[in-house]
UniProtKB/Swiss-Prot annotation:
Organism taxonomic ancestry: Bacteria, Bacillati, Cyanobacteriota, Cyanophyceae, Oscillatoriophycideae
Record-given protein name: DNA repair protein RecO
Cystine pairs: none
Species: Rippkaea orientalis (strain PCC 8801 / RF-1)
Gene3D superfamilies: Nucleic acid-binding proteins, Recombination protein O, C-terminal domain
Transmembrane segments annotated in the record for this chain: none
């Protein structure tokens, strides 16, 4: 049996190990998560130094080890240099990497997850200075949770299975969102559920629900195309922040861990919760 194997993968995490080595966690479409040592990667003249950095995609030759595999060759295919040029984008990319590390598994193909992460990292790179990181993060988290099979239900009530649509005619209208329930909960007294209502973690208004229900599409919704003109106001930016935080907390609830890089995104945005 061969003691080496080939893989293509993106570096999601790295840490020093030994005197000059680096321990990396890689997402590979063929093999899923791989943990491997990059020998001498911390030496200034090492050929593998730049190839073992965060978000670099390589063709790899890996030697199997008793406890840890070892990367013996790496040829870079792609990287995301613009992420490291702006701290907010870098923190956002690390946030997505933390989420993917929770969702991915080892020794199983993860091609769909791999391609989706690459696409959302590319979108983060392309965000202009006037665009919201939170809107892109909200959709990225929604897509990643959906592909892992734990995405929230956002079109029907989780208890009654009644279709829910945003009510823009009543400014006081709200719909509930429950982490335990798995998504939306109808709060209307006209159609009460027959089963006990789980804890409501957040109430959403019409703008937030409309945006949330469009996150499943391939690209971000254009507010002017889905919202009435009177809803295109300053609250739109707040709505994206609230939705990103909602989906983050939903993911943390179901995965049982927090994302430290997301807290840095909040700090850089000047947000307090």
């Amino acid at each position: 049996m061969s003691r080496t194997y080939k893989a293509t993968g993106i570096i999601l995490k790295g840490m020093p190990i030994g005197e000059a080595d680096r321990l990396v966690t890689i997402l590979s479409p063929e093999w899923g998560l791989i943990r491997a040592v990059v020998p001498g990667a911390r030496k200034s003249k090492s050929r593998l130094r730049g190839r073992s950095e965060l978000f670099v995609i390589n063709d790899l030759l890996i030697a199997k080890g008793r406890s840890l595999d070892k990367i013996t060759q790496a040829d870079t295919l792609e990287s995301y240099p613009k992420l490291s040029q702006e701290l907010g984008k870098l923190a956002s990319g690390q946030y997505l990497a933390e989420l993917v590390l929770c969702l991915a598994v080892s020794e199983q193909p993860q091609g769909e997850l791999y391609e989706l992460l690459k696409e959302h990292l590319r979108r983060l790179e392309d965000i202009s200075s006037g665009q919201s990181l939170h809107s892109h993060l909200a959709q990225a988290v929604f897509h990643l949770l959906a592909i892992a099979g734990i995405g929230p239900q956002v079109h029907r009530c989780c208890l009654t299975q009644e279709t829910l649509a945003a009510n823009f005619s009543d400014p006081r209208w709200r719909v509930g969102f429950s982490f335990e329930g798995g998504g939306l909960i109808n709060l209307s007294p006209q159609n009460p559920p027959q089963t006990p209502v789980p804890r409501i973690n957040q109430e959403l208004g019409a703008i937030e629900l409309c945006l949330l229900q469009h996150l499943g599409y391939s690209f971000l919704p254009q507010p002017r195309q889905i919202l009435p003109p009177e809803s295109l106001n300053d609250f739109l930016g707040v709505a994206w922040v609230r939705l990103e935080l909602l989906l983050r907390n939903y993911a943390q609830y179901h995965l049982g861990r927090s994302f430290r890089s997301a807290e840095l995104v909040d700090t850089l945005s000047g947000l307090e919760f």
